Amino acid sequence: MLQELSVAKVADNSGAKEVGIIRNLGGSVKKSSNIGDVVICSVKKAIPNGIVKKGQVVKAVIVRTKYGIKRENGQHVSFDDNAVVIIKEDKSPRGTRVFGPVARELREKGYLKIVSLAPEVL
């Protein structure tokens, strides 16, 4: 669960390395976002010749959280870090690679391209 002003790693090769969450989309009083939710972020750290630059405001989808998620079958899945993938307006990723595992819930929320690029789906 990530809230406003949380810092997350970027799990793709779009050029950003770290982002800060500005706003959780999906409601005016929504306090936190979980895996599969779209957030508006500001790029805090970036590589010099990447697609996105430092200070740029982008949309991203959350792919990993330390808080984790509880599934209907009783499993509790959590990760070592908080990570996002930067997306375009049509829900497709801006980068061409995704690093690290992603949660299975992304497939249910319609992010099939991110799931297919990921090396492991938990």
Swiss-Prot record:
GO terms for molecular function: large ribosomal subunit rRNA binding; structural constituent of ribosome. GO terms for cellular component: cytosolic large ribosomal subunit. Pfam families: Ribosomal_L14. InterPro entries: Ribosomal_uL14, Ribosomal_uL14_bac-type, Ribosomal_uL14_CS, Ribosomal_uL14_sf. Keywords: Ribonucleoprotein, Ribosomal protein, RNA-binding, rRNA-binding. GO terms for biological process: translation. It comes from the Bacteria. Gene3D superfamilies: Ribosomal protein L14 (2.40.150.20). Binds to 23S rRNA. Forms part of two intersubunit bridges in the 70S ribosome. Belongs to the universal ribosomal protein uL14 family. Part of the 50S ribosomal subunit. Forms a cluster with proteins L3 and L19. In the 70S ribosome, L14 and L19 interact and together make contacts with the 16S rRNA in bridges B5 and B8. HAMAP family: Ribosomal_uL14. This is Large ribosomal subunit protein uL14. It comes from Mycoplasmopsis pulmonis (strain UAB CTIP). The gene is rplN.
